[in-house]
Amino acid sequence: MKGGVKICKSGGVRFGMIILGKYNVPLYPNSGITFQNRGGEIVFRGECSIGNASVISVGEKGHIDIGANFSATTSLKLVSFHKITFEENVLIGWNNTICDTDFHQLTLVESTNIIPAYAPVLIRKNCWLAQNCIVQKGTELPSYCVAATNSLLNKKYGIPSKSLIAGQPAVLKKTGIYRDCKNDKVIY
């Protein structure tokens, strides 16, 4: 493994602050985590828990910046060959894929201009990506937003904070809504 891992947290580092491969959900195999770094960098800015059956892959020039209180339940596929940034308090549900590259560039027929194969991804603070979301290059999600199950995020979302997006591709469905993690207990 090449590359680097940095921990930047005021107040110091403590045992158990970063947990990778945690067995959270028995619906997925307890296979830990696959971690591949080809020379890039991962920065942890506080507590982080990434569940079992997950993969982190960082390319030679890739950069992943994970804000404090990051949580991904299980089977996260996180691939960076450019730049992915998560601000603080981001929650990721089951089986999400977040990738800042297509791995292939495309050429426009009319002009022969090339569409870049990569672009940064930015998930701002207090966002929640429900299960089975795909986040593609160039995605930017405002603070306190929710991406519904099976959503495809593929652009800079110029929407208000505290909005719900859904669909393939994801579009604005509702404003004035967010997940309050301090009041999130469901009683069945």
Where are these regions (language model features)?
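A short acidic, glycine-rich active-site loop
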Residues: 112-121
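Short alpha-helix at the nucleotide-sugar/activated-sugar donor binding site of glycosyltransferases
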Residues: 146-147
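Domain-scale signature associated with acetyltransferase and cell-envelope carbohydrate enzymes
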Residues: 1-99, 120-126, 132-138, 143, ...
